[in-house]
Amino acid sequence: MYTKLLDKQTKLALIGLGYVGLPIAMEFAKHVSVIGFDINEDRLDKLRNCIDPCGELPTEVFEHKDITFTSSIEKLREASFYVIAVPTPIDSHNEPDLSPLLGATRTVGKVLKRGDYVVYESTVYPGCTEEDCIPILEEVSGLRVGEDFKVGYSPERINPGDKVHTLLNTVKIVSGCDAEALETISEVYKLVVQAGLHRAPSIKVAEAAKIIENTQRDVNIALMNELSIIFDRMGVNTFDVLKAAGTKWNFLPFSPGLVGGHCIGVDPYYLVHKAKELQYHTKMINSGRYVNDSMGRYIGKKVVKKIISQGKNILGAHVLVMGMTFKENVSDIRNSKVADIINEFKDFGAEVDVMDPFASPLEVLQEYGIRLVERPGKKYDAVVVAVAHTTYLKLDESYFMSITNEHAVLADVKGVYRGSIHQMIYWSL
């Protein structure tokens, strides 16, 4: 398989061309012939014109790459090595929504041939690949795993907006349904990963490793958020405490903040789901999720109290929220907890303007019913810097004072302006 790919006697297909799939596809396209498959025609049109809809990859990345973008299932028949990197979200009840993953699996099953390989990159609970996906591949294709085709799991570690930790320089976990599959999958991924591979002993181990990466981070941030609530009641600045505690060599460098997006705020629920199937009720994971999911409303309430403390009526107060994406310097608005802050203000009768230089106004309107403004349009009683975009880091107190009324509140969620605000009412986590 490896030699056939290198000699371009066959092709590699990447299913799902979003934040995760596209960077992987573009790296492989430097070495082998790639079919980039997606069901979103608007996304495909942009990609064919060398535009990354996610805003992560510059135009020049598309140059000199052996890649074809398509939504044609028939085109997939030209491939023999399939990589599935589609979203694995949760539903309104915080249960895993496997419909994109299982849909992609059925699509690949329709074109699967003897000798083919299927590798999953999507984050799932341990057991999902073997218990949910492989049976569909076998049913649709009429083939048998191990005998007729091979399956592996290699969890994605793409971090949108991060130009330091990339696919190339981040160790990649690989696993396979048997020793032969593991060897071949490892050979193929060596083409695009310079940092080396970690060969997991089983698919289930690789799945579990990925799910706990994000669960661990979620729980640690939840601890910082809870400490922030406690320290706020003491009148102690959380970041001052963390700076002092960080002088010890084994203190872990986490900080409080909003936890949203398609990974950290979602993946723990996949592990919770699997634990419930095993008749175990997760305690720490659930507690962490509760704390982090409540932080948007908590921030909103704190700012409301600050406004009222200045003798102002919150009903009709003007608030500007800066940042709508789930994290800094990305366009992704999925599961953004900034929406909770905004809704809290609206529940109290405040008038809210929202701006974000990275977010798509149309996507924000469709997802949250919020109309973004391009620039501040009035004098505000409070400004909430909810997302620490690089463009916001250059702003100073004089700017914030120029767009606010007297005795205005500046809520600095990530604490990026701490120590530099002296005249406004300042608050941070």
Region locations from a protein language model:
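Structural/interface elements that position substrates and couple domains in central-metabolism enzymes
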Residues: 1-429
